[in-house]
Amino acid sequence: MKRINKTAEDQFLINFKAQNPNGTWDEFRNHEQGILYKRLKQHICNDQMYLCAYCEIDLDRENEHEIKVEHFKSKSGSLPGGSNWHLEWSNLLAVCLGGTNTGDDFELPANLSCDSYKSHYEDKNKINDKDWTGKILLPLTLPDAHNFFTFEKVTGKLLPNESYCNTISIDGKPAAETLSIVTKTIEVLNLNCSRLNNARRKLLFHFNNCARERNLRKLHNLLLQWNQGEPKFFQTTRDIIIRDDRICQGLLNGTIRY
């Protein structure tokens, strides 16, 4: 999960909220035949460089039906008289389908993730307070560069980076709570489902194949592809692989040359 820097809210959303202060998300989606909804979704995706806000898989630029708009504070928990989570710009994230499109390849709901699993988690655990701020990581408030995660290279599972978590406060919470917030993030979004674990292992396999060739120039070129420009799918996993490898660090900081 990487930081998301949202740009300014679209004026058409501001106008809709002014005219419909209690408007629902469905009402906005259907407003003007859905044209404004599609524009808003594209804006959100552009801010995220077409990566899922939670698991970081690529979002399909050519098929907007493969992309959902997620409400970090689940809109079903928005109460009358309070802030309208349905239309709150800072509450809107672009996410993948969370495994709902994998057919029979993976057992469900065990292999749901992201907002698809969050919704399942809320129902299963009868969650009433659906404001997840300060309970799980919010991509909008993450540090620009962070090391909240590591991962098991055998299983592909994400793990909290405990020593780092204990030094960083997040969302106004003391650093002593960060480890539990990161742990809860993995749980609520099901970031360790087999489907995502397998994808991380595949990325590591690709790296290991390149590293085994002992061609430092080729490895350096791979690292530059991973480490420069816009974030790529599973960028957090790429960053962890680079961070944990001495040769990678040496190639990037210039202490190892070829």
Swiss-Prot record:
Putative HNH endonuclease component of antiviral defense system retron Ec83, composed of a non-coding RNA (ncRNA), a reverse transcriptase (RT), a probable ATPase and this protein. Expression of retron Ec78 confers protection against bacteriophage T2, T4 and T6. At multiplicity of infection (MOI) of 0.02 cultures slow growth when infected with T4 but do not collapse, at MOI 2 cultures enter growth stasis. It comes from Escherichia coli. Keywords: Antiviral defense, Endonuclease, Hydrolase, Nuclease. InterPro entries: HNH78-like (IPR013467). One of its GO terms (molecular function) is endonuclease activity. This is Retron Ec83 putative HNH endonuclease. It comes from the Bacteria. One of its GO terms (biological process) is defense response to virus.
